[in-house]
């Protein structure tokens, strides 16, 4: 009883739904959490951090694929998802250049050097968060949110 197996890279199961549609749905699903986070923190840097991490992730993917003479895949929205997830994982007081550096690391080192979409060994946004946490521990861990402290309202 011998079977012929065809060994090929993933994905092994295919569907009519394209990965670009799935990534777009993920972006749409993340938008309410993003807007609530920006509103909740009320920090002037929060929306800029989202914009910078997302734009630098898309730009890093575009530049890398152009330099390596690969087909440009920014239309699949995976870089947008990575930039958005990274922004949601970072403290809102983080300098914008660190967010951009994290996005570039996520796209080039964690995603593209391992083969691109679906071939990476870990989530690029979380890999970038680990990189930033190891590289800039003070900025990544020191975040003080102004809170209201005092006795309960019944004590008044």
Could you tell me what each predicted segment is?
Residues 1-2, 67, 71-75, 93-100, ...:
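Non-transmembrane, aqueous-exposed alpha-helical and coiled segments at domain scale
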Residues 40-46, 90-99:
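Transmembrane helix interruption/hinge and helix-loop junction motifs
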Residues 1-58, 62-65:
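N-terminal signal-anchor module of multipass membrane proteins
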Residues 25-33, 49-61, 78-83, 87, ...:
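Alpha-helical transmembrane segments in multi-pass membrane proteins
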Residues 10, 59-71, 107-118:
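C-terminal ends of transmembrane helices
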Residues 118-156:
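Long hydrophobic alpha-helical segments that form multi-pass transmembrane helix bundles
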Residues 72-82, 98-104, 119-129:
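Cytoplasmic-side transmembrane-helix entry/capping segments in multi-pass membrane proteins
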Residues 66-67, 71, 85-86, 90, ...:
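Charge-biased, low-complexity intrinsically disordered regions
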């Amino acid at each position: 009883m011998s079977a012929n197996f065809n060994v090929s890279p993933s994905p092994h199961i295919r569907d009519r739904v394209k990965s670009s549609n799935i990534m777009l749905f993920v972006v749409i699903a993340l938008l309410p959490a993003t807007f609530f986070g920006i509103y909740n923190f009320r920090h002037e840097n929060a929306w800029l951090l989202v914009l910078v991490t997302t734009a630098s992730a898309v730009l890093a993917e575009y530049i890398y694929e152009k330099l390596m003479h690969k087909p440009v895949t920014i239309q699949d929205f995976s870089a947008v998802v990575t930039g958005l997830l990274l922004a949601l994982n970072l403290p809102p007081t983080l300098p914008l250049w660190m967010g951009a550096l994290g996005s570039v690391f996520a796209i080039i080192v964690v995603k593209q050097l391992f083969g691109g979409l679906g071939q990476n060994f870990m989530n690029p946004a979380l890999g970038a968060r680990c990189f930033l946490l190891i590289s800039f521990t003070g900025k990544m861990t020191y975040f003080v949110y102004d809170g209201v402290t005092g006795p309960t309202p019944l004590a008044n």
